[in-house]
């Protein structure tokens, strides 16, 4: 019932956003539009540049890690396990996000230049490598990479993994909120043109008013994180079994991502000929995985699974 209500609210919100221009747009002139053109750089020292995206990305990961650390302490799990979890998670998130972008969105380019998948370099016209930083991280790839990393963490630590995955899933929403704010500071992953009253103009893209989808997603993630921690505080594992929060987060995030893609500009050219874009196609299996995990964990997992192997 909780899931159905939440999904209905997602649909109503996205429907309001998508149709807002028909209802409200004509009431506002371009003077009401928000022209969004921040400097993505915080400061430069020599060749070093500190970007807002990097700072917000790091803030999201640190705060998410802090939340998981609190749960480890609450359940009396040894500190060494948390330290190992951080290492595995970082590798899974980074490699998954990077490879996800390279293989899902630009496979032809990166398969011909595999070194650029892993190293922050590019090749110039003369065939020489130069430092260019990493350009392109895919959130779906990050989710897949993180889940694989958690499986390796389970193999190494022998911990009951479902509670850990629950905590990581809750924390992921917090990290995602800050990452989308970083995208906003970079004026990237923009929405489709619109005339809704809250439209943003991104001068680095064009002069068209667009849906600020980065804000939509960031606000959704903040709300989802808040709802999840309230549910966890009220129910913990007394009324639900381990795996519940993981399943719920997968369904909510994938469901919202599928919906918001309708007002998001396509990321790569080949998506123009697709019925659904790449983000939507990748969201479908994650949503179905959440459904399967919800049924399996709540019917088959023991209630005391979260208390095993915690030394």
Model-derived features: positions:
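Hydrophobic, membrane-interfacing alpha helices
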Residues: 3, 8-311
